[in-house]
From Swiss-Prot:
The gene is groES. GO terms for molecular function: ATP binding; metal ion binding; protein folding chaperone; protein-folding chaperone binding; unfolded protein binding. Together with the chaperonin GroEL, plays an essential role in assisting protein folding. The GroEL-GroES system forms a nano-cage that allows encapsulation of the non-native substrate proteins and provides a physical environment optimized to promote and accelerate protein folding. GroES binds to the apical surface of the GroEL ring, thereby capping the opening of the GroEL channel. The keyword Cytoplasm applies. It comes from Pseudothermotoga lettingae (strain ATCC BAA-301 / DSM 14385 / NBRC 107922 / TMO) (Thermotoga lettingae). This is Co-chaperonin GroES. InterPro entries: Chaperonin_GroES, Chaperonin_GroES_sf, Chaprnonin_Cpn10_CS, GroES-like_sf.
Amino acid sequence: MKVTPLGERLLIKPLKEEKKTEGGIVLPDSAKEKPMKAEVVAVGEKVENIDVKVGDRVIFSKYAGTEIKIDDVDYIIIDANDILAKIEE
């Protein structure tokens, strides 16, 4: 299934980070904080104010966007203004 965000929105895929306590215990998803890093999957046709493209990794506002699931994969549709930074490695 292909999803194309409309207007000034982006489709992003949250990056999974395994969380461990100092003692080495792996925390379950229910105990983790909401991720704030993601990979850009699709960009709406009216996104102009930020320099991001498909494949970029970004940091976004903690509670921004609408969470959706497509083919058992979690995504977020987010407004371009909620992208805070681009991660460059």
